[in-house]
Amino acid sequence: MDHALLELARRRPVVFDGAMGTEIQGRSLTAADFGGREGLNEILSVTRPDVIRDIHRAYLRAGADVIETNSFGANAIVLREYGQEGRARELSLASALLARQVADECSSPEWPRYVSGSVGPGTRLPSLGQIGFPGMLACYREQVAGLLEGGVDLVQVETCQDPLQARIAVLAAREAMAAAGREVPLFVQVTFDRNGTMLLGTDPLAAVVSLAGLPGVSAFGINCATGPEDMHHVLAELARACPLPLVVLPNAGLPENVGGVLTYRLTPADFARHVAGFVTELGVAFAGGCCGTTPAHIAALVDALRGATVGARSPVLPAAASSLFSAVPFAQAARPLILGERTNDNGSKAFRERLAAGDLEGMVGIARDQQAEGAHLLDGCLAMVGRDEA
């Protein structure tokens, strides 16, 4: 899609802001500031908008091109834990209006500033059956609707730990855009641990295959979980495969408990050096910070990127199928690609009988047998007359 922010990224690196949550924690707010719901950062957009405005302004003064709304958990999934599930659209709208106001105040024709609508992962993982598809879809759709109404320039689905959760959020965002009659760029960011997998075990190629090609996604990347020094190997893999512009927002290192206080030790200078290297060496187009980063970290990054250009990339995304854990390219070194078809109840009497009996272990056993026999992919079909596939 054509959008001024995407066009800007084709000319120079685009800098996002840093952390919201840890900045709020450093403000010594009381329970009264949260309306008696301490820990619900999103409610501050209503109860203490001055605090949120100050944080936004600090990042813009540091040189950020993009600020994120205070809406990371502004969906009914999270708000239900505070008894506020009916306020998702209200809080999303309020956060977007605050960020929009501050961004417009700091914008000029020569240097426009942008607002990103932050959509966090929530607290339920659909791949583990903790929440159903329709319920999660409705929650995200409501959140994004509020952000769009408040005037965000893009929607940022971030800190994703479950590919299915990310896919649901993308679908919800597109539905909300269609309902609003307004399409904006859609960024997707996943989270990898130091071992290079997402929380449920998804590897980088599987994440790219399952998410980067979704309709409407404009940029793909990673944020949170680790500092930049632990992201390099994953980001390098994404740079080789992802056909979309890359975005990276690391933490200020790994958190440490110092005297009972969660502390991030990576200095602004070291943070900027690492992240600027991602831009020039790995071709990252959008860079900023996550937990523990401050306006000082973003100011250092802006200085480090002054005059820099985004490194060239020639990504090659293989045609592949992805599971929750890994991706299998269709072009195998030792051909042919072998497709196991005995996990299809239309073609396997043994599988159909186990399906009818609800024998999950038996069905998995058939799948494992085919894998042991050399199958690269499995043809899974659970459609049976009279059976609820859900």
What residue ranges belong to the model's regions?
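Domain-level signal for soluble alpha/beta catalytic cores
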Residues: 1-390
